[in-house]
């Protein structure tokens, strides 16, 4: 009976977890921000000088043939010479669909959807202000390619203002990397001092996340400051209030499942992280850097970095010690991080993510074996006490208080913990939840094949074979546990339906997670047989 109740407890905890994470995604209140960091849209101008996406961009300049194209081993980028905005970015090494040659496009600007990275110079003498429009840069050519044997590729753009000041904007691309350096060089050849301020922002059409209860994912903004290591800023929150947070260093990003774009200004600079939603339905998040005063005859360099690529924790950590937090494992991150490390460790040896998941399942089950043994031992003792418990029920009848006292005395006398069977399950659930988020968030599993019909561990089984096998394994586990005659009929019914309910739930789960659960069930069945054999020798059945 105790074992049956434990299986029922697993089911209830599992369903509760799904409902809780859906509530977190939809209804959970965001942290209360200080008055200085968030202000109402109606009463603030987040950055009066920061231009809108298309301000000052002639229609003719948006034609594909006028864009500057850049090709590296990792990125296929298009830059609009008006302003020098990145208006297109395809990830060459990451395909849109498995087995197809079409690369995954992260940034683009189409008739119905905008997702671009904008940067420029604002301030008193800025060349990209909302009032003056955008600077029309000139380039030596319109096509740049990272050649074989070349580690970096520079794309210089030049603009000469009416006062004779030369502004050079250089994009520096790196082999094997998804980050781009954006460097401004300002040569003040005028007779007057200049005052400029760099900004960078990401603009995206507000679009709902392709999320579900089974695979909750986040699409929206996020930022980091010296006081807030990592915080999501949902589109609906951006529509209600503007972010305006002074900080040293920091970063601003747009997130979606597996991929991220982010502005990372220098960590030693004084910046302001800001956000807004424009009238055209564009969500904006970015940074404004320090104000620079440039004396006549002086030259000033201002730099920042932009990342556009997968949520690769190693690459992100190299840019900022908090940018890797965009791989969000939730409240059990402290448990998920070592699990992810172990998963990567196994994969580096076996070269197959499915086999790595099996190995980590065996590891987890092996580490939890003492708890599992204690669980079944406690359940066996409880079963042996059933005749005595039944005798207490008959003796005390409806007097629940006396019967409860007698039961506690019996447990104490027989050295049985009535919660002994539940505690190991409660300890195992956090591990399952942490692994769930690791498999959901780790971009390494995107398009990662296993074997046979499983070609992508990050999506559901196309033929539902793994979920059906998982349900069958639950049915076997259930049948190995006899139903006690004293068990409530309603509980019996719920237990009989539990494998079916779990199978239905797991139909839409990533096949990597179903594989973990299936292998875990098989190992549990084997462990159960081994433990029961030992208990029978001790007279516990």
Curated annotation (Swiss-Prot):
Q: How does it sit in the membrane?
A: Multi-pass membrane protein
The biological processes this protein is annotated with in GO are: protein insertion into membrane; protein transport
| Gene Ontology molecular function, alphabetical | membrane insertase activity
InterPro entries assigned? Membr_insert_YidC, Membr_insert_YidC_N, YidC/ALB3/OXA1/COX18, YidC/Oxa/ALB_C, YidC_ALB_C, YidC_periplasmic_sf
User: Can you tell which superkingdom this protein's organism belongs to?
Assistant: Bacteria
Subcellular location field: Cell inner membrane
Q: Which Pfam families match?
A: 60KD_IMP, YidC_periplas
Q: Which terms are listed as keywords in the entry?
A: Cell inner membrane, Cell membrane, Chaperone, Membrane, Protein transport, Transmembrane, Transmembrane helix, Transport
Transmembrane stretches in the record are 6-26, 349-369, 420-440, 457-477, 500-520
**One Gene Ontology cellular component annotation?**
plasma membrane
Q: Which family does it belong to?
A: Belongs to the OXA1/ALB3/YidC family. Type 1 subfamily.
Q: How does it assemble?
A: Interacts with the Sec translocase complex via SecD. Specifically interacts with transmembrane segments of nascent integral membrane proteins during membrane integration.
- Described purpose of this protein according to its UniProt entry: Required for the insertion and/or proper folding and/or complex formation of integral membrane proteins into the membrane. Involved in integration of membrane proteins that insert both dependently and independently of the Sec translocase complex, as well as at least some lipoproteins. Aids folding of multispanning membrane proteins.
Protein name, please? Answer: Membrane protein insertase YidC
* Originating organism: Shewanella sp. (strain MR-4)
């Amino acid at each position: 009976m105790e074992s049956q109740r434990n299986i029922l407890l697993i089911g209830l905890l599992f369903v509760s977890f799904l409902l809780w994470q859906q509530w977190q995604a939809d209804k959970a209140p965001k942290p209360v921000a200080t008055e200085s960091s968030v202000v109402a849209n109606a009463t603030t101008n987040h950055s009066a000088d920061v231009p809108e996406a298309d301000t000052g961009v002639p229609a003719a300049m948006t034609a594909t043939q006028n864009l500057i194209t850049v090709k590296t081993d990792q990125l296929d980028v298009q830059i609009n010479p008006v302003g020098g905005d990145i208006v297109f970015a395809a990830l060459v090494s990451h395909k849109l669909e498995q087995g197809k040659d079409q690369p995954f496009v992260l940034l683009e600007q189409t008739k119905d959807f905008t997702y671009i990275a904008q940067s420029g110079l604002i301030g008193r003498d800025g060349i990209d202000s909302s009032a003056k429009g955008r600077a029309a840069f000139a380039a030596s050519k319109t096509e740049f390619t990272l050649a074989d044997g070349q580690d970096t590729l520079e794309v210089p753009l030049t603009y000469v203002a009416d006062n004779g000041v030369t502004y050079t904007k250089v994009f520096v691309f790196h082999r094997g990397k998804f980050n781009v350096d954006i460097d401004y060089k300002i040569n003040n050849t005028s007779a007057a001092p200049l005052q400029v301020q760099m900004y960078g922002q990401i603009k995206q059409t507000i679009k709902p996340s392709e999320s579900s209860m089974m695979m909750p994912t986040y699409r929206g903004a996020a930022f980091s400051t010296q006081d807030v290591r990592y915080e999501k800023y949902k589109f609906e929150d951006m529509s209600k209030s503007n972010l305006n947070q002074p900080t040293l260093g920091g970063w601003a990003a747009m997130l979606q499942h597996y991929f991220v774009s982010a502005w990372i200004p220098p960590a030693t600079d004084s910046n302001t992280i800001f956000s807004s939603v424009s009238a055209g339905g564009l969500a904006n998040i970015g940074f404004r850097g320090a104000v620079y005063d440039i004396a006549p005859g002086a030259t000033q360099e201002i730099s920042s970095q932009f990342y556009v690529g997968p949520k690769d924790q190693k690459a992100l950590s190299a840019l900022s010690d908090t940018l890797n937090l965009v791989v969000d494992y939730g409240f059990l991150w402290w448990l998920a991080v070592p699990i992810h490390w172990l998963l990567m460790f196994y994969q580096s040896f076996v070269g197959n993510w499915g086999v790595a998941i099996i190995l980590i399942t065996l590891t987890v089950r092996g580490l939890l074996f003492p708890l599992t043994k204690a669980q079944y031992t406690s359940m066996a003792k409880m079963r042996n006490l059933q005749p005595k418990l039944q005798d207490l029920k008959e003796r005390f009848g409806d007097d629940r208080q006396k019967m409860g006292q007698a039961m506690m005395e019996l447990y104490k006398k027989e050295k049985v913990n009535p919660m002994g069977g539940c505690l190991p399950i409660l300890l195992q659930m956090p591990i399952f939840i942490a692994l769930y988020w690791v498999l959901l968030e780790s971009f390494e599993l995107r398009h990662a094949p296993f074997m046979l019909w499983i070609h992508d561990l990050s999506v559901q089984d196309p033929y539902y074979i793994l979920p059906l096998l998982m349900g069958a394994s639950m049915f076997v586990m259930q049948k190995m546990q006899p139903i006690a005659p004293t068990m409530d009929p309603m509980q019996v019914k719920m237990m009989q339906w539990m494998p079916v309910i779990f199978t239905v739930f797991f139909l839409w789960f990533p096949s990597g997670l179903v594989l973990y659960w299936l292998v875990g069930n098989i190992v549990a069945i084997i462990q159960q047989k081994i433990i029961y054999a030992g208990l029978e020798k001790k007279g516990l059945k």
